Amino acid sequence: MXNIRKSHPLIKIINSSFIDLPAPSNISAWWNFGSLLGICLALQILTGLFLAMHYTSDTATAFSSVTHICRDVNYGWILRYLHANGASMFFICLYLHVGRGLYYGSYLFKETWNMGVILLFAVMATAFMGYVLPWGQMSFWGATVITNLLSAVPYIGTDLVEWIWGGFSVDKATLTRFFAFHFVLPFIISALVMVHLLFLHETGSNNPTGIPSDMDMIPFHPYYTIKDILGLFLMILALLSLVLFSPDMLGDPDNYTPANPLSTPPHIKPEWYFLFAXAILRSIPNKLGGVLALVLSILILIIIPLLHTSKQRSMTFRPLSQCLFWLLTADLLTLTWIGGQPVEHPYVIIGQLASILYFMIIIVIMPLASLTENYLLKW
């Protein structure tokens, strides 16, 4: 009798994806983040679903409904903070996952990589719209500032902004549609994740050496299932520590003040995971230029496979490229710090230099360093 795991039309898909999947024998803990992202997505959909049962997307009651969830709904407070801090864990895992792809040359799986960039955009859009829903000061003004950037689009800009707002300012219509999109996007993301995995399983996983590992594969279960469970426990530990000990550490105190269109907060800034983009946006003293730089700071990931000039895939044996990779990491951390600072000297110039360096490292310095390494190895 055939094994149901290998014969059932539905179960055999799961089997070939998570159980009998051949995986390289030497993939490190940096390969854990894919599964962690899947768990983050499931957690966000689950907590979000229960929050949506009690939330009202109306400007008059949105803020009160969030307060009601935290005060009156059974375990509503933990749902709300798991959802808010779960987003932070999601982005930590996302950035580490992308960083892993850059370091080990995983971007040469072009379909998987491009799908990943689309996923990154979708998750960022979802997180932005979710931040608007509690209808606090930072929600309202963040929505106003970011949607207003679209007015920089030549000719159709103003019409575009008013179309997205559903009126002449961020108001009732905006909140309702943002809630609708915020609810539906995670399900679209789930479908895109399936496509991402489909493309990945066409080629199989990369590994730290960057050398094809077809001759040395092991089954995903039990080796990597147990390894992923360890990663999961560590992530849950970090998330619960955050939720139970300092749930507001990563939030903005301004968001505990109900939205007021007549009073602008002194510093309008996004959540920490968008600060690097905010710093790049405001380092250019021109609206359209800033918006282009903002979009390109993420869209640049699409062209990274074209900028790969090294004869080696991974950075494991390339010290020069390694130094530049960690310089890029430090540069992004600098941009994140600058994004949270007021627009004054010396933060402005630091932000501008860090922004220039960010694009220079990716477009010019790294490809040149790779060519240099090829030359030094007489390739």
From Swiss-Prot:
The organism's taxonomic lineage, starting at the top: Eukaryota, Metazoa, Chordata, Craniata, Vertebrata
Any one GO molecular function term: metal ion binding
Positions of heme b b566 binding: H97, H196
Transmembrane segments: 33-53, 77-98, 113-133, 178-198, 226-246, 288-308, 320-340, 347-367
Natural source organism: Pipistrellus abramus (Japanese pipistrelle)
Function per UniProt: Component of the ubiquinol-cytochrome c reductase complex (complex III or cytochrome b-c1 complex) that is part of the mitochondrial respiratory chain. The b-c1 complex mediates electron transfer from ubiquinol to cytochrome c. Contributes to the generation of a proton gradient across the mitochondrial membrane that is then used for ATP synthesis.
Keywords: Electron transport, Heme, Iron, Membrane, Metal-binding, Mitochondrion, Mitochondrion inner membrane, Respiratory chain, Transmembrane, Transmembrane helix, Transport, Ubiquinone
Note: Heme 1 (or BL or b562) is low-potential and absorbs at about 562 nm, and heme 2 (or BH or b566) is high-potential and absorbs at about 566 nm.
CDD domains linked to this entry: cytochrome_b_C, Cytochrome_b_N
Cofactor: binding details: Binds 2 heme b groups non-covalently.
InterPro entries: Cyt_b/b6_C, Cyt_b/b6_C_sf, Cyt_b/b6_N, Cytb/b6-like_sf, Cytochrome_b, Cytochrome_b_C_euk/bac, Cytochrome_b_N_euk/bac, Di-haem_cyt_TM
PROSITE patterns: CYTB_CTER, CYTB_NTER
GO term, biological process aspect, one: mitochondrial electron transport, ubiquinol to cytochrome c
UniProt family annotation: Belongs to the cytochrome b family.
Residues binding a ubiquinone, per UniProt: H201
Keyword Protease: no
Subunit structure, as described in the record: The cytochrome bc1 complex contains 11 subunits: 3 respiratory subunits (MT-CYB, CYC1 and UQCRFS1), 2 core proteins (UQCRC1 and UQCRC2) and 6 low-molecular weight proteins (UQCRH/QCR6, UQCRB/QCR7, UQCRQ/QCR8, UQCR10/QCR9, UQCR11/QCR10 and a cleavage product of UQCRFS1). This cytochrome bc1 complex then forms a dimer.
Membrane topology: Multi-pass membrane protein
Gene3D superfamilies per UniProt: Cytochrome Bc1 Complex, Chain C
Cofactor(s) annotated in UniProt: heme b
Principal subcellular localization: mitochondrion
Protein name: Cytochrome b
